[in-house]
Amino acid sequence: GHMDHCQNAAYLANALNIPIAMSKKDINMIPDNREQKMSAKTLLGKIVLLVSLRSFEKDTLEVFEPMVYLQDGDNLNKYGVDAKVVELPGHTEGSVGLEIEGDKLFVGDALMNMFYPTISMLYTDKDKMLESAKRIGEMGAKTIYFGHGKPKRNRKWVK
């Protein structure tokens, strides 16, 4: 995943003695977040992309080794978390969400609420990003927790 979501993963894993979990599809981003080329369509998205790319160039990411590789449908009960993994590719190749208690969905950057709730402004694969946004919308009445911004009720994100 991107630095703004995993920059402290190594520190937290060591300090709390917990495993790092992520999708294997994003493993190439651990040493360098620029490994997956990002695109944006809107002016606001292009501004966010420019700021993100500058951050990737100057910020450092302590290299870490994931202990758990997440896949669609994985249940995390054995790790003490009542959650199910939902693959939401598009923002990155390995974007995942967590469905918790049946009515909460943590979506990372598959959707964004930086300025207003919307589909992801940045993506590695626009078609997959739109498919993931559609999948989220079809998951019914849930509270959506974004990687950025306040939670909102689920709705159709793609027409």
Feature map (PLM): residue ranges:
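Short internal loop-to-helix segment that lines adenine-nucleotide cofactor pockets
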Residues: 68-77
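Metallo-beta-lactamase
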Residues: 59-61, 75, 82-157
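Active-site HxH/HxHxD metal-binding segment of metal-dependent hydrolases
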Residues: 1-68
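Residues that scaffold the ATP/ADP-binding catalytic core of kinase and kinase-like folds
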Residues: 29-33, 79, 115
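Short, glycine/charged-enriched secondary-structure capping and boundary segments
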Residues: 10-14, 34-38, 102-103, 120-122, ...
